[in-house]
Each structure stands twice: as C-alpha cells, then as structure tokens.
Amino acid sequence: MAIVKVTDSNFDDNIQSGVNLVDFWATWCGPCKMIAPVLEELAGDYDGKANILKLDVDENPSTAAKFEVMSIPTLIVFKDGEPVDKVVGFQPKENLAEVIEKHL
C-alpha cells in the first residue's frame, strides 16, 4: 500500500484500526526528506499488516500539537487509535521495522 497523506480533519479516521506509523514531517526538513524513501520501502514491506501515514506539521498544526510533536521527523505508532510508540529523528529501516513489529 502506498503512503497515505493525512490532515487534521481526517487523522482520527485513519488511525482508528490496526497498526499505523505516522510520520510528522515538513517540506523544509532535511532529515524528513532522507527518511521518505525508507518509509516508502516500509509501506511495501508491511502492506496489509501496517499502514504508513504522513502528516505535514506546517499544514496541520492541531494534530502535531495534540501529540506534542516538538521535533521532526517524529514517528508515532498508533494501534487501534492509541499512541503506543514514538521515535524522533532519522531512523534506519531496521530500527523502524523493529518498532512496527513489536506492535503487530
């Protein structure tokens, strides 16, 4: 499955069921650009098992504030609508895969 871009208005609907890794990012953020291809790979690897979502913090400040996102990229794993894990900064694919795996 492809990465899904979410907004303040549809965020809650998109995280309600299953395992969802949300990338809180911005267009001007260098590490956010570096992690994008890693997330694309994970979206393919976990197709049908977990969803990869992206939320632009500049366009959607309410959701970023709700989850206290202070630095980007911040990646939060939601399971059935609840935040269960959080990592901040660029992460190699293996690290993110481990984070996803422990919540499947």
Swiss-Prot record:
Transport listed as a keyword: yes
UniProt keyword Disulfide bond present: yes
Disulfide bonds: C29-C32
GO BP annotation list: cell redox homeostasis
GO terms for MF: protein-disulfide reductase activity
Domain Thioredoxin: 2-104
Annotated InterPro entries: Thioredoxin, Thioredoxin-like_sf, Thioredoxin_CS, Thioredoxin_domain
UniProt keyword list: Disulfide bond, Electron transport, Redox-active center, Transport
Domain of life the protein comes from: Bacteria
GO CC term (a single one): cytosol
Family (UniProt): Belongs to the thioredoxin family.
Function: Component of the thioredoxin-thioredoxin reductase system. Participates in various redox reactions through the reversible oxidation of its active center dithiol to a disulfide and catalyzes dithiol-disulfide exchange reactions.
Name of the protein in its database record: Thioredoxin
Organism: Staphylococcus saprophyticus subsp. saprophyticus (strain ATCC 15305 / DSM 20229 / NCIMB 8711 / NCTC 7292 / S-41)
Encoding gene (name): trxA
